[in-house]
C-alpha cells in the first residue's frame, strides 16, 4: 500500500504524474553499494511507474542485484513542484516493446523519428522496469514563487 504525504492529495499526485512529460529520476545501488542515478521516460498508471530501457543497460544489472530505489519526478523550472519517494522495482521483458512504444508517443509524439526507429529496431531487446512506490511525497512551491518567471 502506497503512503501519500505532502502538498497534494493522491488524486492530485496521479494527475501530475499522468500529465508531466518529464523523466523520472531513479536512484539505485550498484553492486559495490555505491549509489547510481538514472533518468528514464515513464508512464504512470494503476499506482505504478513503468519505464523501458535497453536490456544491456547498467541500471538493469543494478536493479537485478538490488530492487530497492528512490525516485523523483519534478519540474526543472519555476515554480518548482513534483513528487519523490521510494519503493521497489520488478523487471520483465518489454514484450513487443509495448511500453517503449507508449513512451515514444508520450515524449516524442510518435514513432516517426530516427531516434524512435533506432530504439524500436529488431536488434534491441528492451526491459520493462516497473516501480512500485511505497512512499510518495509531493511538494509545490507555486504560492511562494508567484511572480517568478517560468522557463517552461
Language-model segments: residues:
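Short, basic/aromatic recognition patches
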Residues: 1-25
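A short, polar/charged loop/turn motif at coil->beta-strand junctions and beta-hairpin connectors
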Residues: 16-20, 79, 125
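Short, surface-exposed beta-strand-loop junctions and turns on beta-sheet-rich folds
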Residues: 57-59, 78, 145-146
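Structural motif corresponding to alpha-helix initiation and N-cap regions
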Residues: 10-11, 56-57, 113
Amino acid at each position: 500500500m502506497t503512503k501519500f504525504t505532502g502538498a497534494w492529495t493522491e488524486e492530485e499526485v496521479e494527475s501530475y504524474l499522468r500529465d508531466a512529460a518529464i523523466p523520472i529520476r531513479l536512484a539505485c545501488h550498484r553492486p559495490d553499494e555505491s549509489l547510481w542515478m538514472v533518468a528514464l521516460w515513464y508512464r504512470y498508471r494503476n499506482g505504478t511507474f513503468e519505464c523501458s530501457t535497453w536490456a544491456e543497460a547498467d541500471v538493469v544489472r543494478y536493479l537485478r542485484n538490488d530492487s530497492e530505489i528512490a525516485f523523483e519526478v519534478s519540474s526543472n523550472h519555476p515554480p518548482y513542484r513534483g513528487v519523490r519517494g521510494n519503493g521497489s522495482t520488478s523487471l520483465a521483458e518489454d514484450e513487443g516493446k509495448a511500453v517503449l512504444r507508449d513512451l515514444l508517443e508520450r515524449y516524442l509524439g510518435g514513432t516517426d523519428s530516427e531516434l524512435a526507429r533506432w530504439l524500436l529496431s529488431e536488434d534491441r531487446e528492451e526491459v520493462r522496469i516497473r516501480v512500485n512506490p511505497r512512499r510518495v511525497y509531493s511538494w509545490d512551491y507555486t504560492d511562494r514563487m508567484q511572480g517568478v518567471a517560468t522557463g517552461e
